[in-house]
């Protein structure tokens, strides 16, 4: 009989232990205190991108203007028209004229009438309307002028007719008149533009106004010395110089040679020295007369003025030119200005390059005093021919390089871009052009071969055969190009269709249309682009949609969005990684240093807490993801978005242009909201769904019925013999159960459960009880288990409100079982006021606060465009701030976070009414932070033991704060390093070995 009782007792004990295990897990399954999986795990290990060792940060090479050179030229002409016909004196101390002050920030206040009630607007538009405008100038000095300009540049103000922004090679070289070769004739050179140039307006139409204006400027320089310092002198227009211009007097050399006017513009190719044609066949058909003064305001340096001047007076008669157009005879004493217009092209004539000759001086003219260059004395020498070929090849390479830089801005007119451009091994883009849109090349085989030859990198040790072949190919190409007479702008008259991603690997994509016209070179030439471009992903990415189902930490709705928008996942992964790195930077000197684990919770069991630290993490992760998506849109890495299309801010000046290529905050804000908040909003989640809640309610009802039945049995057996140690057993069981409650969230839950079983068995076996008392004891144990786990926390009386709310906020929270337990024992407490709905509302609020932080720290950036630093045109766009700036802003919000609770209506409200209501930019939390000073097994937190601190610091990294008053250990570290290094001739560096003793302080 005793064996039967003992067997029955063991079976009952086993059933009680199993029931304890199941009820404990069921009670805390909805709370999720074992750690909540999060999508931030993509920052540790992502199937979409292979992370490197670098720190994630936004690309700072912003693109202020996403447009071609032609569009910039049109904008420049528009700005010149706004300046007026005559240039007025400029006061450098007046900012209204366009010069930038030292204070680059212009604050424009927009006052809205109070009586107007407007409907709610988008948060991005609301923030942009309140932004301060920052006017940028890359290199400015204390006066606000570009620091790269010299003194002569700062006082050089070019008249209207001289402002040619891009000399076009379509203007043909001047044709010499037949009568120019006749001696003893006086004429003025006739300039005949090419037929292509006649389509556009001739910039010499306002020549009379230009002359009057230049004379007006020189009269002003004589009366006002201050005014003279701001302008360039024109010696050829002075009256006394005009009278002696034909006497052979040499012009006085200025203190500093002025820059050519075309250098203030943006030419396609840099100007090269011109070689004069034989017998007056040079520019303007005039022969060179040494000793005479050049006419006009176009100045070269000393070498060009003595040897290769383009602007020369002539004494020959004027006759009709080849084109049939002629100019009337003019008085040689009248001041003349030869403009730098399109007829004076920067491109040299091929015939003049291949067969140059020397201008023979006339009879009676003074002999040349200086020795001419070798190429003028013997232009047919092999050395001079090679030099001319090298110059032509250099100009062609610069033109090709410029077109390659503009190839990425070629947008299709009829087809959208289906896929993005990613320079990776697994994902790349190829460009396909339909046959109906391809343009047949009219060039010969020599032209194609020359382009292939130019695209090869130049190697100093190249063979003689390759160099000779290039010499053979080059003249043919020059001949063909001159016969075809193709213009520079022909490259922009063709469309490019970007259709799909294909097989390009480890190289930049090439636009076929540009390649057919010689506009594209080698694949490695993108490093020399003049326009700043955003680099593609340097890491290897994999955009397979099947990776979304294997990604760890994503919810069901997030996986669905991942499949639909797989191309955005690398940006989200980089944003999650940047959030982890920024969190560790911001908290590196605090007690909790944002340590991570290798599981899907990223931060361990503390993710189940609604503490301020988790509020900061949620806000920072939402902010970084929004920033990286917005920057990826701007850089062209996503096919679903491009540059920002945001509306124009209200405080922006009317004359300023709103455009450029800004960060697409609108798309990033919407996508980040849908992706991140979907975990909190979905209704069929594992721990927060309606179905799970109903099962919990039904389970509570069943246990409530069982408890009522047990209470009836307890009332009948209220008096138990104290000699049998029944009360001692119940007390020990209660203590064991409460200890299990405090450690229920430990990862070693099974081990604690086994210890509890051993304690119960030991207490029962050591006590002397009979069969009837054992039955009563079973009922009491069962009652204690059920009441402790389920109903004691719900039946806890409501606490009275303390007068000191600060003390109440600093006091440790109470668990559901009503037992005061601090965090110092390693146990983790269940949330008292935070329910599942409150935690979801808290996460939604903090996510929105992170996105608002990105909008808050974004700025409106403007840049001046114009000649010599003048703001003839101002372009503005919106630009993101750095991740570090956003992290600093959110850390300040973390320090001022507000504690909230959920009310009866299911909404969050502040717990202490003395504090102000948090806005959408503030952080909120539900639970107080644990004690980070001591180790916690439940939180997987080792405490601050062994942390390095600073002894003499007064901040958070000081030993007094970081060590929590426990003191610190001091350790001396001896370091041997090289010092006092010196270089000895020859080729030796000798250093001494210095010994340093460093002190390291660690917390006890």
From Swiss-Prot:
<feature type="glycosylation site" description="N-linked (GlcNAc...) asparagine">
    <location>
        <position position="593"/>
    </location>
</feature>
<dbReference type="GO" id="GO:0005109">
    <property type="term" value="F:frizzled binding"/>
</dbReference>
<feature type="disulfide bond">
    <location>
        <begin position="981"/>
        <end position="991"/>
    </location>
</feature>
<keyword id="KW-0272">Extracellular matrix</keyword>
<feature type="disulfide bond">
    <location>
        <begin position="986"/>
        <end position="987"/>
    </location>
</feature>
<dbReference type="GO" id="GO:0030425">
    <property type="term" value="C:dendrite"/>
</dbReference>
<dbReference type="GO" id="GO:0030182">
    <property type="term" value="P:neuron differentiation"/>
</dbReference>
<feature type="region of interest" description="Disordered">
    <location>
        <begin position="238"/>
        <end position="298"/>
    </location>
</feature>
<keyword id="KW-0449">Lipoprotein</keyword>
<dbReference type="GO" id="GO:0048018">
    <property type="term" value="F:receptor ligand activity"/>
</dbReference>
<feature type="disulfide bond">
    <location>
        <begin position="949"/>
        <end position="959"/>
    </location>
</feature>
<feature type="glycosylation site" description="N-linked (GlcNAc...) asparagine">
    <location>
        <position position="724"/>
    </location>
</feature>
<dbReference type="GO" id="GO:1902669">
    <property type="term" value="P:positive regulation of axon guidance"/>
</dbReference>
<feature type="disulfide bond">
    <location>
        <begin position="862"/>
        <end position="876"/>
    </location>
</feature>
<feature type="disulfide bond">
    <location>
        <begin position="583"/>
        <end position="594"/>
    </location>
</feature>
<dbReference type="GO" id="GO:0045773">
    <property type="term" value="P:positive regulation of axon extension"/>
</dbReference>
<keyword id="KW-1015">Disulfide bond</keyword>
<dbReference type="InterPro" id="IPR018161">
    <property type="entry name" value="Wnt_CS"/>
</dbReference>
<comment type="function">
    <text>Binds as a ligand to a family of frizzled seven-transmembrane receptors and acts through a cascade of genes on the nucleus. Probable developmental protein. May be a signaling molecule which affects the development of discrete regions of tissues. Is likely to signal over only few cell diameters. May have a role in limb and CNS development; may be a downstream target of Dll that acts in the specification of these primordia.</text>
</comment>
<feature type="lipid moiety-binding region" description="O-palmitoleoyl serine; by PORCN">
    <location>
        <position position="868"/>
    </location>
</feature>
<feature type="glycosylation site" description="N-linked (GlcNAc...) asparagine">
    <location>
        <position position="485"/>
    </location>
</feature>
<feature type="glycosylation site" description="N-linked (GlcNAc...) asparagine">
    <location>
        <position position="952"/>
    </location>
</feature>
<feature type="disulfide bond">
    <location>
        <begin position="633"/>
        <end position="641"/>
    </location>
</feature>
<feature type="disulfide bond">
    <location>
        <begin position="643"/>
        <end position="661"/>
    </location>
</feature>
<feature type="compositionally biased region" description="Basic and acidic residues">
    <location>
        <begin position="389"/>
        <end position="403"/>
    </location>
</feature>
<keyword id="KW-0217">Developmental protein</keyword>
<keyword id="KW-0325">Glycoprotein</keyword>
<feature type="glycosylation site" description="N-linked (GlcNAc...) asparagine">
    <location>
        <position position="60"/>
    </location>
</feature>
<protein>
    <recommendedName>
        <fullName>Protein Wnt-5</fullName>
    </recommendedName>
</protein>
<comment type="similarity">
    <text>Belongs to the Wnt family.</text>
</comment>
<dbReference type="GO" id="GO:0005615">
    <property type="term" value="C:extracellular space"/>
</dbReference>
<dbReference type="GO" id="GO:0061643">
    <property type="term" value="P:chemorepulsion of axon"/>
</dbReference>
<feature type="disulfide bond">
    <location>
        <begin position="933"/>
        <end position="964"/>
    </location>
</feature>
<feature type="glycosylation site" description="N-linked (GlcNAc...) asparagine">
    <location>
        <position position="115"/>
    </location>
</feature>
<dbReference type="InterPro" id="IPR043158">
    <property type="entry name" value="Wnt_C"/>
</dbReference>
<dbReference type="InterPro" id="IPR005817">
    <property type="entry name" value="Wnt"/>
</dbReference>
<dbReference type="GO" id="GO:0007411">
    <property type="term" value="P:axon guidance"/>
</dbReference>
<dbReference type="GO" id="GO:0050919">
    <property type="term" value="P:negative chemotaxis"/>
</dbReference>
<dbReference type="GO" id="GO:0007435">
    <property type="term" value="P:salivary gland morphogenesis"/>
</dbReference>
<feature type="region of interest" description="Disordered">
    <location>
        <begin position="438"/>
        <end position="472"/>
    </location>
</feature>
<dbReference type="GO" id="GO:0070983">
    <property type="term" value="P:dendrite guidance"/>
</dbReference>
<dbReference type="GO" id="GO:0005102">
    <property type="term" value="F:signaling receptor binding"/>
</dbReference>
């Amino acid at each position: 009989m005793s064996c039967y009782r003992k067997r029955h007792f063991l079976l009952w004990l086993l059933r009680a232990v199993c029931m304890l295990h199941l009820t404990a897990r069921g009670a805390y399954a909805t709370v999720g205190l074992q750690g909540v999986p999060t999508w931030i795990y993509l920052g540790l290990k992502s199937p979409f991108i292979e992370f490197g060792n670098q720190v994630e940060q936004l690309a700072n090479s912003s693109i202020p203007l996403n447009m071609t050179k032609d569009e910039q030229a049109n904008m420049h002409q528009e700005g010149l028209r706004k300046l007026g016909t005559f240039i007025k004196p400029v006061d450098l101390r007046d900012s209204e004229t366009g010069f930038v002050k030292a204070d680059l920030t212009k604050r424009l206040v927009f006052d809205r009438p109070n009586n107007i009630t407007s409907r709610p607007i988008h948060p991005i538009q609301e923030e942009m309307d309140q932004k301060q405008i920052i006017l940028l100038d890359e290199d400015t000095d204390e006066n606000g002028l570009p620091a790269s300009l010299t003194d002569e540049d700062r006082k050089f103000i070019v008249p209207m007719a001289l402002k040619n922004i891009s000399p076009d090679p379509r203007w043909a070289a001047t044709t010499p008149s037949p009568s120019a070769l006749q001696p003893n004739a006086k004429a003025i050179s006739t300039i005949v533009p090419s037929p292509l140039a006649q389509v556009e307006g001739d910039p010499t139409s306002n020549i009379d106004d230009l002359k009057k204006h230049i004379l007006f400027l020189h009269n002003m320089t004589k009366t006002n010395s201050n005014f003279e310092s701001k302008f360039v002198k024109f010696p050829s227009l002075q009256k006394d110089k005009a009278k002696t211009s034909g006497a052979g007097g040499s012009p006085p050399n200025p203190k500093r040679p002025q820059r050519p006017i075309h250098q203030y513009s943006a030419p396609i190719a840099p100007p090269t020295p011109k070689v004069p044609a034989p017998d007056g066949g040079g520019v303007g058909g005039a022969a060179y007369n040494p000793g005479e003064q050049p006419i006009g305001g176009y100045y070269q340096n000393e070498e060009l003025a003595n040897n290769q001047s383009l602007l020369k007076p002539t004494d020959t008669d004027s006759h009709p030119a080849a084109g049939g157009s002629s100019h009337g005879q003019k008085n040689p004493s009248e001041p003349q200005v030869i403009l730098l217009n399109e007829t004076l092209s920067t491109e040299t004539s091929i015939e003049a390059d291949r067969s140059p000759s020397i201008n023979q001086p006339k009879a009676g003219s003074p002999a040349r005093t200086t020795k001419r260059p070798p190429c003028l004395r013997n232009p047919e020498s092999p050395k001079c021919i090679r030099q001319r070929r090298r110059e032509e090849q250099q100009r062609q390479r610069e033109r090709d390089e410029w077109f390659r830089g503009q190839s990425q801005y070629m947008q299709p007119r009829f087809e959208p871009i289906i896929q993005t451009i990613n320079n990776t091994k697994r994902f790349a883009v190829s460009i396909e052009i339909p046959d109906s849109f391809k343009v047949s090349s009219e060039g010969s085989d020599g032209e194609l071969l020359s382009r292939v030859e130019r695209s090869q990198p130049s190697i100093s040790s190249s063979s003689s055969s390759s160099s000779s072949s290039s010499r053979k190919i080059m003249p043919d190409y020059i001949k063909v190009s001159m016969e075809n007479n193709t213009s520079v702008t022909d490259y922009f008259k063709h469309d490019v269709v970007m259709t799909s991603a294909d097989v390009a690997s480890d190289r930049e994509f090439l636009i076929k249309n540009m390649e057919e016209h010689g506009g594209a070179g080698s694949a490695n030439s993108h490093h020399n682009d003049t326009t700043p471009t955003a680099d593609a992903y340097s890491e290897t990415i994999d955009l397979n949609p099947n990776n979304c189902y294997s990604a760890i930490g994503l919810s069901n709705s997030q996986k669905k969005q991942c499949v639909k928008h797989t191309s955005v996942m690398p940006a989200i992964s980089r944003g999650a990684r940047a959030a982890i790195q920024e969190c560790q930077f911001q908290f590196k000197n605090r007690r909790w240093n944002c340590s991570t684990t290798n599981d899907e919770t990223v931060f361990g069991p503390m993710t189940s807490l609604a503490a301020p630290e988790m509020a900061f993490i949620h806000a920072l992760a939402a902010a970084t993801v929004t920033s990286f998506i917005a920057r990826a849109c701007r850089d062209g890495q996503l096919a679903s978005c491009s540059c920002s299309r945001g509306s124009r801010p209200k405080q922006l000046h009317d004359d300023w242009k709103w455009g450029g290529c800004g960060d697409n905050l609108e798309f990033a804000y919407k996508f980040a909201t849908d992706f991140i908040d979907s975990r909190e909003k979905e209704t069929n989640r594992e721990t927060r769904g309606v179905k799970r809640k109903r099962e919990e309610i039904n389970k509570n009802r069943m246990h409530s019925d069982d408890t009522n039945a047990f209470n009836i049995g307890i009332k009948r057996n209220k008096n138990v013999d104290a000699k049998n140690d029944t009360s001692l057993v119940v007390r020990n069981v209660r203590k064991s159960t409460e200890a299990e409650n405090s450690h229920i969230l430990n990862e070693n839950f099974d081990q604690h459960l086994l210890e509890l079983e051993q304690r119960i068995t030991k207490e029962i076996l050591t006590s002397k009880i009979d069969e009837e008392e054992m039955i009563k004891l079973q009922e009491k144990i069962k009652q204690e288990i059920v009441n402790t786990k389920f109903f004691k926390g719900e039946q806890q009386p409501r606490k009275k409100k303390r007068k000191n709310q600060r003390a109440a906020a600093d006091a440790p929270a109470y668990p559901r079982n009503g037992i005061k337990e601090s965090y110092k024992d390693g146990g983790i407490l269940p949330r008292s006021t935070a329910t599942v709905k409150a935690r979801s509302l808290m996460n939604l609020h903090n996510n929105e606060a992170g996105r608002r932080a990105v909008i808050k720290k974004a700025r409106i950036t403007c840049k001046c465009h114009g000649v010599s630093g003048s703001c003839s045109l101002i372009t503005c766009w919106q630009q993101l701030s750095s991740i570090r700036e956003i992290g600093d802003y959110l850390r300040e919000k973390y320090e001022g976070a507000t504690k909230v609770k959920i009310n009866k209506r299911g909404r969050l409200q502040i717990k202490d009414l003395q504090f102000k209501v948090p806005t959408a930019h503030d952080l909120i939390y539900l639970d107080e932070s644990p004690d980070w000073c001591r180790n916690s097994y439940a939180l997987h937190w080792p405490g601050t033991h062994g942390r390095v601190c600073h002894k003499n610091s007064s901040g958070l990294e000081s030993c007094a704060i970081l060590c929590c008053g426990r003191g610190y250990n001091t350790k001396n570290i001896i370091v041997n390093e090289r010092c006092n290094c010196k270089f000895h001739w020859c080729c030796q560096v000798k250093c001494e070995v210095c010994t340093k003793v460093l002190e390291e302080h660690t917390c006890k």
